[in-house]
Swiss-Prot record:
Residues 205-282 form the ACT domain. Homodimer. InterPro entries: ACT-like_dom_sf (IPR045865), ACT_dom (IPR002912), Chor_mutase/pphenate_deHydtase (IPR008242), Preph_deHydtase (IPR001086), Preph_deHydtase_CS (IPR018528). The record marks T184 as: Essential for activity. Its EC number is 4.2.1.51. Keywords: Amino-acid biosynthesis, Aromatic amino acid biosynthesis, Lyase, Phenylalanine biosynthesis. Pathway: Amino-acid biosynthesis; L-phenylalanine biosynthesis; phenylpyruvate from prephenate: step 1/1. GO terms for cellular component: cytoplasm. It catalyses: prephenate + H(+) = 3-phenylpyruvate + CO2 + H2O. This is Prephenate dehydratase. Residues 5-191 form the Prephenate dehydratase domain. GO terms for biological process: L-phenylalanine biosynthetic process.
Length: 322
């Protein structure tokens, strides 16, 4: 490709754009052509991911996890329920906010305040202490909150320093966050393909669909434990098809090319109703020991398709499930 097209949660000035700029500077965007890349702001995280599925973008940069509120549900749901996508890189940002206004506005003038819900949750205590009388209005991003101030729709906004600069606003208060170690993790998502090479400090992620029977979830998770693999996250999300049915997101330390991780994925493929591989990528995490693989079987062929970026390719004649 001559220009890599990357969709992200917009408009311009969001923390997501800042994360994308960091990934670009670190050389984490695959297949960047001679003409560089083109950033494309979208109105929502699902819109950014759907742009990749539809071919309008090569990659999407989206938030996936926050240290205060946990996982970003729209991102997880879209990755699990839509057609297959794969994570290729990640970065983490320290998150601090500014309270911004137009020039000439003081704290006493603030009657309405726009905030992205995730941002509002991270400055709730500060707002209660300093702007308790302001009416909180929702924004679909931090940059949109700043835009609402610039357009005169609200008096003030909780937003990022980048967005404030883009919209020519001034900060009444800067560096605001209730928890001093607030951080958000962002991922770069594309169509399925060969994962980045193993670095020794990698993360692997998958979504498990498990039959509703006693002991099935414990048995699935045991495939990691018996191999000494560190699970860094497990989370359930509703399938959206029937009440009381769930998908399970798991993140582990390691790479699909680590023997123990490969064996765990193959065991899950045999055991679970479905396994959606979300990728293996550099994440700064230490890995455990590796082992030599056993002779090939259907699960080995399935794993080979994941490594080749072809998760939907049919099994060879005589093979098991897809």
């Amino acid at each position: 490709m001559s220009v890599a097209r990357i969709a992200y949660l917009g408009p311009e000035g969001t923390f997501t754009e800042a994360a994308l700029l960091r990934m670009t500077a670190a050389g984490l965007v695959p297949d960047t052509g001679p003409d560089g890349l083109r950033r494309w702001p979208t109105e929502s995280t699902p819109a950014a991911l759907d742009a990749v599925r539809g071919g309008a973008a090569d990659y999407a940069c989206v938030p996936i996890e926050n240290s205060i509120d946990g996982s970003v549900a729209p991102t997880l749901d879209n990755l699990a329920i839509g057609s297959p996508l794969q994570v290729f890189a990640e970065t983490t940002l320290d998150v601090e906010f500014n309270i911004v206004v137009k020039p000439g506005i003081t704290a006493a003038d603030i009657r309405t305040l726009a905030a992205f819900p995730v941002a509002a949750a991270q400055v709730r205590q500060w707002l209660a202490a300093h702007l308790a009388g302001a009416e909180l209005r929702p924004a679909y991003s931090n940059a949109d909150a700043a835009r609402q101030v610039a357009y005169g729709q609200v008096d003030a906004a909780v937003t990022s320093p980048l967005a404030a600069t883009r919209w020519g606003l001034i900060a009444l208060a800067a560096g605001i966050v209730d928890e001093p170690n607030a951080r958000t993790r962002f991922v770069l998502v594309g169509m399925p393909g060969p994962p980045p090479a193993r670095t020794g400090t990698d993360r692997t992620s998958a979504v498990l669909r498990i039959d509703n029977a006693p002991g099935m979830l414990v048995a699935a998770l045991a495939e990691f434990g018996i191999r000494g693999i560190d699970l860094t996250r497990i989370e359930s999300r509703p399938t959206r098809t029937e009440l009381g049915t769930y998908l399970f997101f798991v993140d582990c330390v390691g790479h699909i090319d680590d023997g123990v991780v490969a064996e765990a994925l193959k065991a899950l493929h045999r055991r679970c109703a479905d396994v959606c591989y979300l990728g293996s990528w550099p994440a700064g995490l230490a890995t455990g020991p590796t082992v030599s693989p056993p002779p090939p079987d259907e699960a080995s062929r399935w794993l080979a398709r994941l490594r080749a970026g072809k998760p939907d390719q049919a099994s060879e004649p005589g093979g098991g499930k897809l």
